[in-house]
Curated annotation (Swiss-Prot):
Protein's organism: Helicobacter pylori (strain Shi470)
UniProt binding sites for substrate: D90, S91, G92, G93, F94, D144, Q189, G215
Residues the entry annotates as binding Zn(2+): C303, C305, C308, H334
A Pfam family it matches: TGT
Name of this chain's protein: Queuine tRNA-ribosyltransferase
Upper lineage: Bacteria, Pseudomonadati, Campylobacterota, Epsilonproteobacteria, Campylobacterales
Pathway(s) it belongs to: tRNA modification; tRNA-queuosine biosynthesis
Recorded GO CC terms: cytosol
Amino acid sequence: MDFQLQATDNNARAGLLNLAHSQVATPVFMPVGTQGCIKSLDATDMQGILGAKLILANTYHLYLRPGEKVVEELGGLHRFAQFHGSFLTDSGGFQAFSLSDNVKLQEDGIVFKSHIDGSKHLFTPAKVLDIQYSLNSDIMMVLDDLVGLPAPLKRLEESIKRSAKWANLSLEYHKQKNRPNNNLFAIIQGGTHLKMRSLSVGLTHEGFDGYAIGGLAVGESADEMLETIAHTAPLLPKDKPRYLMGVGTPENILDAIGLGVDMFDCVMPTRNARNATLFTHSGKISIKNAPYKLDDTPIEENCACYTCKRYSKAYLHHLFRAKELTYARLASLHNLHFYLELVKNARNAILEKRFLSFKKEFLKKYHSRSH
């Protein structure tokens, strides 16, 4: 993997991430395709309509169903899903904790029961890499010990030491495999405790292809999250991509870009779409509300997305009320277009040294109304 830093504007960064299946301009937002697809969308929607170059899939879910060996036998995740861009896969540790009963944390890994059939499984640092090799992920995340917030200091310290140990074991294992197209990212933990974040960075070896800031958006305040990012991002190697996991709102993303983060993922645009919330530059709207029943205008004037060029708010209101499956697709296409355009415009602003004014102007309009 090759990462080229093209421009900076204060702490904001614009770069190019060269992966085996695509070249990705950063900052980048990665749509979340947990099961190997973005809910309600297919590869043609993602590539031909949205132009997405990098999407996220979930190791835990694909391991349990259909099984990584099935995906491997069918040509890997790209051929299986017919997505010819790149895939980042997370390690599955978070899902093992959040979806399973009777999770047991051990020094060598995580023992969990499948949420599908109750069968028992062990995720170790090597095991989750083997799964991701079978999937043929472009970017693989290491297994980590995620802690919900707030958490006692002792538990945070235990988490970062275990996460760093697992990351370093993963790096050594990966070096033996000679798989240059499968890139490995470390994950920095430590909650909102700044000394713990510094310790986590210090314990994690150099030599990873990228570094993620994990363990945020799990119960802390927005101010705590931003303070943690502001502290952690400058500690990470300047020549490697920085990934903020699971974040977030348009405001969160712009704030984090301004603090030096390059990569983002979140279910928000698609989950909100399915629940009737649509993003516009003037704030969010709830398409299920009565005023849209006779509204013959698009979700947003001047929006170039597939949905806005073809359909009215009245039609989307009708589809949502009628519980039609097509609603989820049209709404998701709009919200993902909004997010992808947001980071694209942020990138252009960084290249032109006007990021702060771009952010200020965007947020002023975005907060002007929500209805």
